[in-house]
């Protein structure tokens, strides 16, 4: 009896399996082209591909662009902050006090907030319009990462700094109204989400308070 490897067995005896795999790949490709769902395998080249897709999404913004990432860093600002193409848009970033208080590995005397503030100040001198907001709290009240582009919201499987370096996904939220409203609510409430420059002045004060009011607790169906 001839010996067949598992791969050869499926090719010879289960041709329908190959057809299914081909159809599955076509379907995933169509989702990727429409920016509905994209899977990144974590291979070495995937990180640069993931970064390029995020930059493309940011560049497509015509009305608003908000990046929500509790670990948003100086590196992310320099990589993504310059990719808004519309002069009418202020790129808004929401990050967390918990991360900004942490030390920088390569610069142990500096905090993440210090170097992010310096980079933001430098970009502002080149007329790049970016505002950064800081969610207060000893622990970040924000866990997931998402990007608002006009009336769309895209969920990221990891923070921008590592996006694509391991297996992860980008997913367009079917009904984004709640997340858009939540991001806007954070930005408007300076008591829980001040601008970075304001937070820098008082960063050792009040950040340990609870964040009981930080989430919009209404049902999604109640939000217009």
Per-segment meaning from a language model:
Residues 72-75:
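Short, solvent-exposed loop/turn at the beta-strand->alpha-helix junction
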Residues 1-50, 77-224:
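PLD/PLD-like phosphodiesterase catalytic module centered on the HKD motif
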């Amino acid at each position: 009896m001839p010996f067949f490897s598992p791969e050869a067995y499926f090719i010879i005896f289960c041709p329908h399996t190959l057809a299914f795999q081909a159809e599955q790949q076509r379907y995933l490709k169509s989702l990727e082209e429409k920016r509905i769902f994209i899977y990144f395998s974590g291979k070495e080249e995937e990180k640069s591909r993931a970064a390029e897709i995020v930059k493309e999404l940011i560049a497509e913004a015509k009305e608003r662009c908000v990046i929500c990432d509790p670990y948003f860093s100086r590196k992310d600002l320099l990589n993504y902050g310059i990719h808004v193409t519309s002069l009418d848009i202020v790129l808004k970033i929401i990050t967390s006090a918990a991360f900004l208080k942490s030390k920088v590995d390569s610069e142990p005397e500096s905090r993440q907030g210090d170097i992010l503030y310096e980079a933001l100040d430098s970009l502002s001198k080149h007329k790049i319009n970016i505002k950064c907001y800081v969610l207060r709290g000893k622990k970040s009240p924000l866990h997931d990462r998402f990007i608002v582009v006009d009336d769309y919201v895209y969920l990221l499987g990891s923070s921008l700094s590592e996006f694509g370096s391991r297996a992860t996904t980008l997913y367009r939220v079917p009904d984004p109204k709640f997340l858009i409203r939540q991001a806007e609510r954070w930005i408007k409430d300076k008591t829980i989400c001040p601008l970075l420059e304001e937070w820098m002045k008082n960063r050792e004060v009040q950040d340990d308070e609870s964040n009981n009011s930080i989430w919009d607790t209404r049902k999604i169906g109640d939000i217009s």
